[in-house]
Amino acid sequence: MTTDLSDDGSRVVSRRNFAALSAGALATGLAGCFGDDPQESANGNGSSTGNGDREYTIFASMPAVWDFVRQAAGDHMEAIDLVPVGEHGHDWTPEPGMVEELDGAAGFVYLRDFAAWQDDAADQLEGRDDVHVIEASDGIEFFDSPAEDDDEHWWMDPVECQNGVENIADGLAEIDPDNADDYEANAATFIDELEALNEEFHDIVERAELNSIVVATHDSFQWWNRRYGIDIYSPVGTSPDDAASPGDVEEVETLIEDLGIEHVLYDVGEPAPLAESLAAEVDAEILPLSPVETQIDGSPEVDPSVEMEPDWGYVEHFRELNLPTLETALRAE
């Protein structure tokens, strides 16, 4: 584990590592046909903007991207999230027959460098005339965060998200130029919502007594440090497969006591035994965060009092989970 300095000189504890997925295994996973009706597949989560009768179907590579697509598409296109409800978008990979054909799809929207299967799928689909590949991250510069070099979690920043939404709207307009003005207008409406989230973030930070949080599951949140100056400490890396060493945990326990932190935060899409044990060790409470990488129907494993809906979009994940958690953890109530 490394202890790094943020832009304002504060310490941020995390591990600079990430797991790469096997390209060989991916090739097997891209070997067949998705099916006549993607929404009926047991693999996809079936989330869409409508009833399946629209002319165009767009496949998204993870939940946040799916919501950006449906917001920009409006009534003109179906948006399908390939990641099943309950699966974590960071470490899920397609089963054989899910991606290569994408029967009926007009587009595939993905995140660069987020998961190996997405980049490989985009490379394979680029050669096809019937599927338009849209890189949501196009033109977005990753940065070397305390969690990892080239931290790709830009969608956690509501301001940076605005660029991603515009990229998607531009791609949809290329697929369906007759409705280009609508895609631009839909994106502008959603960008207004993202800007409202940004203002709510700033309001919480301005009212906060603390400036630090501890995340005891994988660290997807360092873009909040860059945008809002929130110091984020984690004994875990940026992948759900990363593990914390006893030394990492002990260092974070010391930081919790030194900084007067009263809450340990966890990713709702992951089991969180470390968050629970760490909270018990330092007499803290656990609170949920969402990196918008998992759709959940009901409650996360850790806390049955948290109720989620499988069709929540980006704004719901932030307003129902992230902002209330930060308000409490940073003592901005």
Model-derived regions: residue spans:
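Extracytoplasmic metal-acquisition and chelation regions
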Residues: 2-15, 19-29, 33-333
